[in-house]
From Swiss-Prot:
Entry function: Cell wall formation.
Lineage: superkingdom: Bacteria
Name of the protein: UDP-N-acetylmuramate--L-alanine ligase
GO BP: any one term: cell wall organization
Residues reported to bind ATP: 125-131
Keywords, in A-Z order: ATP-binding, Cell cycle, Cell division, Cell shape, Cell wall biogenesis/degradation, Cytoplasm, Ligase, Nucleotide-binding, Peptidoglycan synthesis
Keyword Hydrolase carried by entry: no
PANTHER family: UDP-N-ACETYLMURAMATE--L-ALANINE LIGASE (PTHR43445:SF3), UDP-N-ACETYLMURAMATE--L-ALANINE LIGASE-RELATED (PTHR43445)
Amino acid sequence: MKHSHEEIRKIIPEMRRVQQIHFIGIGGAGMSGIAEILLNEGYQISGSDIADGVVTQRLAQAGAKIYIGHAEEHIEGASVVVVSSAIKDDNPELVASKQKRIPVIQRAQMLAEIMRFRHGIAVAGTHGKTTTTAMISMIYTQAKLDPTFVNGGLVKSAGKNAHLGASRYLIAEADESDASFLHLQPMVSVVTNMEPDHMDTYEGDFEKMKATYVKFLHNLPFYGLAVMCADDPVLMELVPKVGRQVITYGFSEQADYRIEDYEQTGFQGHYTVICPNNERINVLLNVPGKHNALNATAALAIAKEEGIDNEAILEALADFQGAGRRFDQLGEFIRPNGKVRLVDDYGHHPTEVGVTIKAAREGWGDKRIVMIFQPHRYSRTRDLFDDFVQVLSQVDALIMLDVYAAGEAPIVGADSKSLCRSIRNLGKVDPILVSDTSQLGDVLDQIIQDGDLILAQGAGSVSKISRGLAESWKN
């Protein structure tokens, strides 16, 4: 769709000198979302990625110029270049951009420019960001507020991870992995929790990570709002340093928005939220696990503070379809040994894996859990090795894939073979290492039993592998 010159630049009128915006790594979830919003706003968008996929195809159909592979000629005509944190310094497009003195900015800097003219709600934290962002977006949509949202994963009910709305609201996932969330200046900031992760960014110093989160919260104006989980002792330690209005949520007695009487029936949650004015709200949540009740209560708290009515909040949570790759049920399949259910989940930190297993246990009763686990990054495997050993020992059967490197060089003792050895030595489960994923289906058929829940777990290619498995099992 062509846009007139007058229709262009409604969000950021000061960017009138910008004609074409080029994204290096445009296929990434966060990058594609921002590209889609700017494309819909009328900017010329180009971008490159190492592989074609659903996201790049959708952007191309919407009018973006997409290149597969990286080459310096791809930046021709660009007024500004946006880079993903995954892009290396020797990328030919990045090198050429600097040589031609084209401004190069991080993804979060472009998001900050879009947020500058909006009522921004930024969601940060080690776990739960994507789901919480999706929940807030769906509540505001249900309330007919038509928000713009940019999420790090698919918002299933919207069928996309980004949407350009007509209202002043912008709801966005804030990325702490490279500390780029410090560029954002929202009106409301959510912090779901904090644990050591991406420690290379913080020089291995958790205190530095905590200080960075405080800086992020200090980006709020004095009339802004910080929403923090009362169940997280690290966050509660930081509250006195925030210097802004803080509201808390959680199961804790001290929480401003307090969760009581949580029960899980199948893969749904039921609970009551006690509000600061002692109002009691009974919630039906269409996704499982106490961790999702926390995510939903953060969203509820923001909505209540904004004055959104209970009906819109409750309808959005009862109808919530989840975020992409968050306990994503791929279907039930008949195999030689019986019927099994296959679930794909993005969790790749020990805490995330643990809450996924817990939610599956509560929803699946006494059935066995068979996990296909793909470690994500050698550095994370090294830093959290003992935690991975403990949490992966909680399943009934474990298939281990090779580490998904995400561009990292191998680290001795932080590979899948070492992980398998330590898990086996713990004596609770005997993992099977599958390096050739073409053999995965055959290995599964040898070990699965009638009624098993198969969890494909990790942030790398395991999702594509599990979806390929689901397709082959349909035939």
